[in-house]
């Protein structure tokens, strides 16, 4: 039985969003909104505290998996494997297809568990000299990196995908595989749009190309791909076995909590850098800690919402308006990611806030997970988030030019959300 009125939950969520927009630390903003929402909704101090504790407990599964993913991400980034993958793709596709090479390399690097901001930082020094040589603009290459990153993100073991999989109690690999077609559409749209704007905006100056003084000995491409390939194979093992009705393999269920670190460690040994295990895994953990804290904060506000009657109110409103409940999944992902300017936080909050309501209107758990996850990449790049500024800095782009790129990013994200909605909302 709900103990919190829906209005309190909504007010708490709005307060959290306003605090985030005012540059308050997102973790404190989410906790603050949760406390205020619980009290306004009529809960006692004790009940509010218990709802928040229950909410944070509900995200612990995602927290553990995100921490585990830090092993793989840390090894790929610190060993130079991610950079080697990008270099090889750009080199093989050549100057004539530089935008496709940039988008594809960004997609692959993000798909194996690297955050989009980090992907842009890795790919930018490789892309800038080639882009200047062929005469394409900053806007074009940045869109290629961002669009490719968005496409990779929805099929990656990144926090947003982990959170929606856990929130709807489906396998991580199912969500990753389920978003594959939308991701391919996103990659194609990225290439087309980036090509169309390749002569628009500022050209790259010689002085803006960073000097690449790197004493790190990077692994060969084959060795760099060992960890990603093993991760993909192990994650896909059970879903593929179920699809093909292979009884023996379908009974083998290995959680991402095991798969991602194991893949990373095997990759590390394959690259001959076993002596760097502590250094790389520590770096990976440090990269994941901000996301872990946001997960806990999002769990707090989700706890308040789950103890309210908001889901019932949302379902009633949808039924009264006659709008298909299918649209609630992508729209919630879009709005929450826009409010928080974060794919991960948006996906987490959308799942916790609207998950029950989405299931109540008849949407299957896997469909809901994929649609929220793709919706979360539509307008997650707004200026009140770190990604907006980090991506601009990677290519030395001023704020005015960076703002002009936002509609094109939304076109890419929107193409993936629309594709997912058509497939999982109407075709399946």
Place the predicted regions along the sequence by residue.
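Long, contiguous bundles of hydrophobic transmembrane helices that form the permeation core
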Residues: 2-9, 13, 36, 40-41, ...
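Membrane-interfacial loop-to-helix junctions in multi-pass transporters
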Residues: 3-7, 57-62, 89-104, 133-141, ...
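Short helix-coil transition sites and intra-membrane helix breaks within transmembrane domains
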Residues: 22-26, 60-62, 73-83, 110-122, ...
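Core transmembrane alpha-helical segments of multi-pass membrane transporters/permeases
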Residues: 28-31, 47, 51-83, 108, ...
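Hydrophobic alpha-helical transmembrane segments of multi-pass integral membrane proteins
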Residues: 67-68, 92-126, 296-298, 321-363, ...
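Re-entrant/interfacial helical elements at transmembrane boundaries that shape
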Residues: 71, 84-86, 117-130, 158-168, ...
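Alpha-helical transmembrane segments of multi-pass membrane proteins
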Residues: 96-109, 134-154, 175-180, 184, ...
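Membrane-core helix-loop-helix motifs of multi-pass transport proteins
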Residues: 128-225, 364, 387-424, 428
């Amino acid at each position: 039985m709900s103990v919190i009125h829906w209005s309190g939950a909504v007010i708490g969520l709005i307060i959290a969003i306003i605090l985030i927009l005012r540059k308050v630390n997102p973790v404190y903003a989410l906790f603050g909104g949760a406390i205020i929402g619980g009290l306004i909704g009529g809960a006692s101090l004790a009940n509010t505290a218990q709802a928040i504790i229950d909410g944070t407990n509900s995200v612990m599964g995602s927290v553990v998996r995100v921490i585990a993913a830090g092993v793989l991400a840390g090894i790929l980034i610190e060993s130079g494997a991610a950079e080697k993958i990008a270099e090889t793709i750009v080199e093989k596709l050549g100057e004539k297809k530089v935008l496709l090479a940039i988008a594809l390399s960004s997609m692959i690097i993000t798909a194996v568990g690297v955050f989009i901001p980090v992907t842009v930082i890795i790919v930018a020094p490789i892309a800038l000299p080639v882009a200047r040589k062929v005469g394409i603009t900053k806007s074009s290459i940045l869109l290629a990196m961002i669009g490719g990153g968005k496409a990779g993100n929805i099929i990656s073991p990144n926090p947003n995908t982990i959170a929606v999989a856990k929130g709807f109690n489906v396998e991580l690999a199912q969500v990753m595989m389920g978003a594959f077609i939308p991701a391919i559409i996103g990659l194609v749209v990225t290439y087309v749009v980036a090509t169309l704007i390749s002569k628009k905006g500022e050209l790259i100056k010689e002085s803006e190309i960073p000097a690449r003084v790197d004493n790190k000995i990077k692994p060969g491409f084959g060795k760099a791909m060992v960890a990603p390939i093993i991760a993909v194979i192990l994650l896909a093992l059970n879903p593929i076995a179920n699809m093909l009705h292979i009884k023996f393999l379908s009974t083998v269920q290995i959680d991402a909590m095991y798969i991602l670190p194991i893949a990373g460690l095997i990759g590390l040994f394959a690259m001959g850098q076993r002596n760097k295990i502590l250094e790389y895994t520590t770096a990976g953990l440090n990269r994941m800690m901000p996301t872990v804290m946001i997960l806990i904060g999002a769990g707090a506000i989700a706890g308040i919402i789950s103890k309210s009657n908001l889901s019932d109110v949302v379902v009633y409103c949808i039924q009264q308006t006659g709008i298909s409940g299918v649209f609630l999944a992508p729209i919630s992902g879009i709005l929450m990611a826009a409010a928080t300017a974060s794919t991960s936080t948006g996906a987490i909050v959308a799942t916790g806030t609207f998950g029950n309501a989405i299931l109540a209107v008849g949407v299957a758990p896997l469909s809901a997970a994929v649609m929220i996850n793709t919706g979360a990449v539509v307008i997650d790049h707004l200026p009140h988030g770190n990604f907006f500024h980090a991506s601009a800095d990677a290519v030395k782009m001023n704020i005015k030019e960076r703002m002009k790129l936002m509609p094109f990013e939304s076109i890419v994200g929107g193409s993936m959300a629309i594709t997912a909605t058509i497939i999982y909302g109407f075709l399946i």
